[in-house]
From Swiss-Prot:
Pyrrolidone carboxylic acid found at: Q441
PTM characteristics: O-glycosylated; contains chondroitin sulfate (CS). CS attachment is pH-dependent, being observed at mildly acidic conditions of pH 5 but not at neutral pH, and promotes self-assembly in vitro.
Disulfide bonds: C35-C56
Glycosylation sites: S433
GO cellular component: chromaffin granule; extracellular space; neuronal dense core vesicle; perinuclear region of cytoplasm; secretory granule; transport vesicle
Subunit: Self-interacts; self-assembly is promoted in vitro by chondroitin sulfate attachment which occurs at mildly acidic pH conditions. Interacts with SCG3; this interaction is optimal in conditions mimicking the lumenal milieu of the trans-Golgi network, i.e. pH 5.5 and 10 mM Ca(+2). Interacts with ITPR1 in the secretory granules.
More details: Binds calcium with a low-affinity.
The species this protein was found in: Rattus norvegicus
Protein name: Chromogranin-A
Cellular location(s): Cytoplasmic vesicle, Secretory vesicle; Cytoplasmic vesicle, Secretory vesicle, Neuronal dense core vesicle; Secreted
């Protein structure tokens, strides 16, 4: 946008300088163009605006001249050309973005394809190993076939020798005949088995690589899935067991800490009341600060944060006390020791709370001083704002809330500390009243100055209109 505006300014300047300076009409036109340039430069320099001269304001009041110059110099066409250039640039940017997206998609696809190629290479590397194993299994099968053929040949030779030997016997015994028949049948069966074995071997050999390939590919995915499921189940079971153990331990701790629940509740209520005090203190301070131009957020946030921290610490101490052993379970000596420890802890807690309250009041004093200083600076920098705030404060009567509003909500458990705080607040209010008087005087003077400035502004407007 700035570049387009700069181009428009350059074009206007070139056209202004190109105008002829012969007649008084052209001189007026040049003045108007210069004023237009000043206005455009003022609009472009927004962080540090440059004021427009009153002469230019007077010249620009004539609308007819401005319109005639705009029509004469064809600025509308130039603006349209600039708009077209911007549209073209946007279209080019969109095209570039689309091209970048397409390139990213192509890169992702290439990555996926490279990953698939790597997987295929891994499987191919595994398959030659299986083939080598199949070849090794085929080699011993061939050796066994040759051994069987040799044994068959030996059996056949022995059978021929036995058949040639007993021929002179005319009438063999029945036992010998039966043995001969058995021997004659056994070689036939062996030959049948031998003939069947080579035919069955190829099928076995074909089956071996199939099983090996299946055994190599199958476990890679199935076993991993099974292992993952088993691990998830084991983790879930372990988590359930841990939760049950924690519940049992908590139940045991609660049963043991039964007698100590009363003091912990008392301590929690005590600190809860303290936390309420802090919140009310912060609310009162925020009201007083709203009258002077501040909402009191700077005090409320740290005080609330401290109260929450203290409350969380006290809850942790109470849980530790609940986790400890009860008083009634131990004999007399141990019970007394526990009581002493409890008393010491209570004393330490009270001491810490007092220290924290002292720190808090000191912090409040520092914040009050800082706020007064900031208010004075703001009054000097921005008189209008200080005047508005002073009028609002007087109209609604938030100036002096009084000590009773701050004392009414305090509990009766710590009357001494409440009275001390009330006196301290009264002193602070007295000191603040002196400061407020000085501030009131300053505000009155500022209001008078503001009224005078308004009168001057009205007069200037009347002069311009006249």
């Amino acid at each position: 946008m700035r570049s387009s505006a700069a181009l428009a300014l350059l074009l206007c300047a070139g056209q202004v300088f190109a105008l002829p300076v012969n007649s008084p009409m052209t001189k007026g036109d040049t003045k108007v163009m210069k004023c237009v340039l000043e206005v455009i430069s003022d609009s472009l320099s927004k962080p540090s605006p440059m004021p427009v001269s009153p002469e230019c304001l007077e010249t620009l009041q004539g609308d007819e001249r401005v319109l005639s110059i705009l029509r004469h110099q064809n600025l509308l066409k130039e603006l349209q050309d600039l708009a077209l250039q911007g549209a073209k640039e946007r279209a080019q940017q969109q095209q570039q973005q689309q091209q970048q997206q397409q390139q990213q998609q192509q890169q992702q696809q290439q990555q996926h394809s490279s990953f698939e190629d790597e997987l295929s290479e891994v499987f191919e590397n595994q398959s030659p190993a299986a083939k080598h194993g199949d070849a090794a299994s085929e080699a011993p099968s061939k050796d066994t076939v040759e051994k069987r053929e040799d044994s068959d040949k030996g059996q056949q030779d022995a059978f021929e020798g036995t058949t040639e030997g007993p021929r002179p016997q005319a009438f063999p015994e029945p036992k010998q005949e039966s043995s001969m028949m058995g021997n004659s049948q056994s070689p036939g069966e062996d030959t049948a088995n031998n003939t069947q074995s080579p035919t069955s071997l190829p099928s076995q050999e074909h089956g071996i690589p199939q099983t090996t390939e299946g055994s190599e590919r199958g476990p890679s995915a199935q076993q991993q899935a099974r292992k993952a499921k088993q691990e998830e189940k084991e983790e879930e079971e372990e988590e359930k067991e841990e939760e049950e153990e924690e519940k049992e331990e908590k139940a045991i701790a609660r049963e043991k800490a039964g007698p100590k629940e009363v003091p912990t509740a008392a301590s929690s209520s005590h600190f809860y009341s303290g936390y309420k005090k802090i919140q009310k203190d912060d609310d009162g301070q925020s009201e007083s600060q709203a009258v002077n131009g501040k909402t009191g957020a700077s005090e409320a946030v740290p005080s609330e944060g401290k109260g929450e921290l203290e409350h969380s610490q006290q809850e942790e101490d109470g849980e530790e006390a609940m986790a400890g052993p009860p008083q009634g379970l131990f004999p007399g000596g141990k019970g007394q020791e526990l009581e002493r420890k409890q008393q010491e802890e209570e004393e330490e807690e009270e001491r810490l709370s007092r220290e924290w309250e002292d720190k808090r009041w000191s912090r409040m004093d520092q914040l009050a001083k800082e706020l007064t200083a900031e208010k004075r600076l703001e009054g000097e920098d921005d008189p209008d704002r200080s005047m508005k705030l002073s009028f609002r404060a007087r109209a609604y009567g938030f100036r002096d809330p009084g000590p009773q509003l701050r004392r009414g909500w305090r509990p009766s458990s710590r009357e001494d500390s409440v009275e001390a705080r009330g006196d301290f607040e009264e002193k602070k209010e007295e000191e603040g009243s002196a400061n407020r008087r000085a501030e009131d005087q300053e505000l009155e003077s500022l209001s008078a100055i503001e009224a005078e400035l308004e009168k001057v502004a009205h007069q200037l407007q009347a002069l311009r209109r006249g």
